[in-house]
Regions:
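Short metal-coordination and nucleic-acid-contact micro-motifs, chiefly zinc-binding Cys/His arrays
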Residues: 91, 103, 111-112
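Cys/His-coordinated zinc-finger cores
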Residues: 109-130
Length: 495
């Protein structure tokens, strides 16, 4: 597991508790102008039972840190989780000045352990390049754990059909979706981190997508593929949708490959995806597929018991139809989540048949271009396993040649779109180079979405514990491909 996915998963567990414990005074079905909100319905006086319930309601937690007191050295932080983070960094991170020594000195500018000593910190001429983002990350993490009311996590409900959503950027999306007014950059970073996965998917698929042929992000093949999907996502209102499209409407199936942190997001966050498509004829089935997917029964529950966002899993059930550990939960009439703990190639047959009008794939930071890391055989591992692992190391293969090879070939054969995301320009370039160089893959696809920045990338820095100088942003850039379709004209000429 990469540092990005590890820190992201921890962050999402924390957000799950924050979302479920937040009880806003203003309902999410309210609208606001200039920060002043009012309920859409007439306010009724509280009944006696309601008043009694208020008296018995748990008091809000005591705020640990004020907004002007968020910067603390991690080692001496008043938050236990931050002190634990500092301990992990000190245990594995190397000093950039003296690489033979572990970090042990907290940078006074950012609060992270970055060097082995003050003398090493003072002699480092590169520290000004990275400490500003580390300080921002420091304050963001303390703010999340300050136990202040997280008003930005009051997520809106269904979008009225007649209200248009704007997907040009985070600010316009939050405004047109009816989020509470967010005036601070820090709150915007928190929300972007929470919503980057469903909004990245929605922005690509939506008819008002910020990616088009006009700005040269979408190719002509991409336009054709997304037009097919959008016919299912945006059926005409007030018409017989099945008659218009000439077929029965099936759920939109979204397959998230190699899922890790994505599967641990609260279901309420994934509900924001169908809210972008308010037609009553549209529903979504989201499949989280990967050996590191977290099943609900494996989620860690705090001492206070399951949270409200975890209670939704009580509606679900284990799903034995995939041949691997799996769990399905109906979140709402328009959204069902499936957690499948296994490689895609193991369940490909069970998921078919596929339809480019309703099926689409996403892979967030798949690491196609990263070197293959073989599984270390356990104590009972045989000699054959050890030889295979050593062979992988010796040939210096990349993940698209080994772990992902069969999966990607199967997807390309189905002619359904595959969109990927990376956490940095270098990460995306590695994936692109891998796709364009691996035999039996490089000539088998067309580009749908040219690689480039993601409008709905997370704006929050994720800091690597193995080297605090390394910080990235989830889903920084995106790309898209699809298996080549047979060129009938070329085939006719060949005969």
């Amino acid at each position: 597991m990469s540092f990005l996915q590890s820190s992201t998963r921890t962050h999402h567990r924390w957000l799950t508790r924050q979302i479920s414990s937040y009880h806003p005074h203003q309902p999410s079905s309210s609208r606001s102008i200039f920060g002043l909100g009012w309920p859409l319905g007439k306010k009724k006086p509280p009944t006696g039972e309601a008043m009694a319930g208020r008296k018995n309601a748990p008091s809000p937690p005591t705020r640990l840190l004020e907004s002007d007191n968020l910067f603390h050295p991690l080692t001496s932080s008043p938050i236990a989780a931050m002190r634990e983070k500092a301990a992990r960094i000190r245990a594995i991170a190397r000093c950039p000045v003296y690489p033979d020594q572990l970090v042990g000195y907290d940078c006074p500018e950012c609060g992270y352990p970055t060097h082995s000593s003050r003398e090493a910190w003072e002699s480092d001429g590169e520290k000004a390049k990275y400490w500003p983002r580390l300080r921002e990350a420091n304050e963001d993490e303390h703010d999340l754990r300050s136990q202040r009311p997280m008003l930005e996590f009051d997520l809106p409900d269904c979008q009225p059909y007649e209200e248009t959503i704007t997907l040009a950027n985070w600010d316009l999306l939050l405004y047109t979706r009816g989020f509470r007014s967010i005036d601070e950059d820090r709150s915007r970073r928190h929300v972007s981190k929470l919503l980057t996965y469903p909004m990245t998917i929605g922005a690509i698929l939506h008819e008002f997508s910020p990616y088009s042929t006009r700005n040269q992000r979408l190719t002509l093949e991409g336009y054709r593929s997304l037009t097919a999907l959008r016919q299912s996502l945006h059926p005409p209102l007030g018409t017989n949708t099945a008659q218009v499209l000439g077929r029965t409407i099936n759920p939109i199936r979204i397959f998230i490959l190699g899922a890790r942190a994505e599967s641990s997001l609260p279901p309420a966050v994934w509900s924001q995806l169908p809210y972008l498509f308010p037609s009553p004829d549209v529903s979504f089935q989201v499949y989280f597929i990967g050996p590191e997917v977290i099943l609900p029964q494996q989620q860690i529950t705090g001492p206070e018991g399951p949270t409200e966002s975890q209670d939704v899993y009580k509606r679900g059930r284990p799903n034995m139809s995939f041949g691997v550990p799996a769990f399905s939960v109906p979140v709402s009439p328009t959204l069902t989540l499936h957690m499948i703990q296994g490689a895609y190639r193991e369940v490909h047959g069970a998921l078919g048949p596929f339809d480019p009008y309703t099926d689409v794939y996403f892979a967030f930071s798949p690491g196609f271009g990263f070197p293959t890391v073989p599984i270390v055989p356990g104590p009972g591992g045989g000699a054959a396993e050890k030889r295979e692992s050593q062979a992988l190391l010796d040939c210096q293969s990349i993940q698209l040649q080994t772990n992902w090879n069969q999966d990607v070939k199967l997807i390309l054969e189905e002619k359904c779109a595959l969109f990927g995301a990376g956490f940095s320009p270098a990460d995306v370039q590695r994936d692109v180079d891998a796709l364009e160089s691996v035999e039996e893959i490089k000539d088998q696809f067309d580009w749908l979405l040219n690689p480039g920045e993601n409008v709905f990338a997370s704006q929050k820095w994720e800091v690597a514990e193995f080297d605090p100088r390394v910080a990235v942003k989830s889903n920084y850039a995106i790309w898209g491909i699809r298996g080549k379709r047979m060129n009938h004209m070329a085939l006719a000429h060949s005969h």
